[in-house]
Amino acid sequence: MRKNFFKKVLAVTLASTMAFSMVGCGNSDSKSEGKKDDGTITLNVWHQWSNDTNELKGRYEEAVKAYEKDNPNVKIKTETLDTEAYKTKINAEFAGDAKGIDVFYWWGAGTAKKLVDAGKVMALDDYLTDDVKSRMVEGSTSAFEYDGKLYSTPMFSWYMTLFCNKTLFDKAGAKLPETYDELVDAVKKLKTLDGVTPLAAGAKDGWNAAFVYQALALREVGATGVNEMLSGKKEFGDEGYKKAAQKSIRLIQIRSFGENPLEQGNDDANAAFENGKAAMRIMGSWFANNVYTDEAATINPEEVVALKIPMISDGNGESTDYCGGYVESFWVNNNTKYKEEAAKFCIYINEKMGVASYETGSGFSGWTTKADESKLNPLFIQIKDLLAEGK
């Protein structure tokens, strides 16, 4: 099981080109709704906020209602799936012509490049007004730019974080880890607590497993090296990637993730941490919102501390390097019948959800649009302070 876990970490990491953002096949049988006799059109929009407890899903629905009110000739039909199922479905749809999709949630940089190269997504340059351009945060669009064209606008950025349950650390007599060696030492002490997994991995969902390796690779190679690899300037052959793999194996060998890490997915790992059954979780900044809003959680949010990914003493990474950035957004299917309407909604929903992500303590908006900071939770503010130290 441990060997299979590592294989999954490495396979997912390579398949997604490590998905750092610092920096299926088959034919679709989906059908577009088309234009009605009264001139109303329906845009089919897909995203991966499928959980009703996710505040962003609610904010998306509010934004859609507002858009339909202001644009009575446009109706929005939404399809949602959990992240892994969503990725599989989208890839299958775009193996064909994806006629049943007008606007969809996706990931930029290397992930979207395959769709761009295949002519599957539409550039938005013709629909970007000077006013829209002026509201986008400087430096927030690089993951959406290909060959001088902009294929999406930013939504929000995120920050990979090590979340720690300080109460469990105190019970185990463990130090909050600032280095990899301290992380290993903490794992050994946390294992003495009955019924507690030192680090919840959620490895049944591949992207969760990949996060562990990505975190270590960032510290071994450094942000500059990783970005050079992602941009094609360097091969995936730096010795640091091998060292990160070896450190991942060591964490598996000392049972950091429990006895059978492949049995738990993302939701299981989140629940384990939120209910005091796991002492650590490596996750994006959006998890801060989960800790405060998940009704099933029993943990006291004040027990949780947000930390940087631990440093590696002889690695090339710097303490200001971080994994995250602006990479997730909505895109337009190049095969849509309603290019102008789809582009306008895409730009609109990216801005609305960017602001919503910040106001809910999930991410950092890619827009200068004023946001309400009055309800930001203390854990998210900790992450905000960590981000301010980053590059």
Ranges and model annotations:
Residues 107-160, 184, 212, 240, ...:
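Hinge/lid segment of periplasmic solute-binding proteins
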Residues 70, 171, 254, 295-361:
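Extracytoplasmic/periplasmic substrate-recognition and gating elements
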